[in-house]
Amino acid sequence: MKLLTLKKAHAAKIKKGYPLIEKEALAGSAGHMKEGDLVDIVSESGGEFLARGYYGLQNKGVGWTLTRNKHEQIDQAFFLSKLTKAAQARAKLFEAQDTTAFRLFNGEGDGVGGVTIDYYDGYLLIQWYSKGIYTFKDMLISALDEMDLDYKAIYEKKRFDTAGQYVEDDDFVKGRRGEFPIIIQENGIQYAVDLNEGAMTGIFLDQRHVRKAIRDRYAKGKTVLNTFSYTGAFSVAAALGGAEKTTSVDVANRSLAKTIEQFSVNKLDYEAHDIKVMDVFNYFSYAAKKDLRFDLIILDPPSFARTKKRTFSAAKDYKNLLKETIAITADKGVIVASTNSSAFGMKKFKGFIDAAFKETNERYTIIEEFTLPEDFKTISAFPEGNYLKVVLLQKK
């Protein structure tokens, strides 16, 4: 077994359950390592055994711990144990009649960092986040085959190109190829999903509870603006909740046809709603000039985005984006402020919110908060894994 030696301070983090092996934690070079190598992680002070894991480059990490038992083998039985435990924890979701898509295995939260598995009405989607974890593909899929999942097919997304980008490929792995789009249900809402059309599927499963809240408690009789709307999933939830009108804005050309599709599978008249393909920042300027006001605004930008004209980073730019949102929010209107950035926590996010309102001389109250749903399992030792922060604010 190859050894990976960590600096003393970082060894203490691993001892407390931190699962990511950070680049800066290494005491010396990892030049002798190759992606997928199983490693024993030891402290530079006396060579104390800390954990067993694998080497795989991912963002700021060089791998993940898998067990703190030096006698445990990392084999098919290991993966089967982790997968079985994860499936058992989601038994209620498997049985649910009105929800047929959810996260089956959530990386380090379920014991194996660098890989996630989503369940889409009988289809499995595996996402690999490093070449290292990808070397365990056959072992992991064989473990899945030992389970009583009765899946229709397995698809995959390889997200380990330069800077963690998606590797364009035919994503079919095994089983019966799906005829896409398939229609999944989420709390009774129908969404069209394609597992073999690029990096994304058409729905972000981690926002399930937020869409339900919008439909059930916030949309009725309201004018709704959905920014960075992607396929319009929030807009559909609002329309089904009785919104007077929704406006969906996204810069991607594909968003128009995809949003029409999501309205149509729910038997909603998409022509009664506005779907705009344009830069959200330009739309804010347009709305301010036209003196438009919305009762409910959904603000869920990507953590990082680059267009021809600008670069957006949630960590740097969310406050200013929120200031523009506040300007077109009606009195007593609600803003769904959301971010999936793992670069900062809820406390800092609330700091952005507070600063935005102070700088616009407006007041607000927090009426509801969300983090990841229960199927996106996290561990307290790795707060970065609980990346989703959603705060519902009412403008006073």
Swiss-Prot record:
Chief location category: cytoplasm
Localization terms from the record: Cytoplasm
Membrane-crossing segments per the record: none
InterPro entries listed in its UniProt record: PUA (IPR002478), PUA-like_sf (IPR015947), PUA_sf (IPR036974), RlmI-like_PUA (IPR041532), SAM-dep_methyl-trfase (IPR019614), SAM-dependent_MTases_sf (IPR029063)
Molecular function GO labels: methyltransferase activity; RNA binding
EC assignment: 2.1.1.-
One Pfam short name: PUA_3
Descriptive protein name: Putative ribosomal RNA large subunit methyltransferase YwbD
Organism: Bacillus subtilis (strain 168)
This protein's encoding gene: ywbD
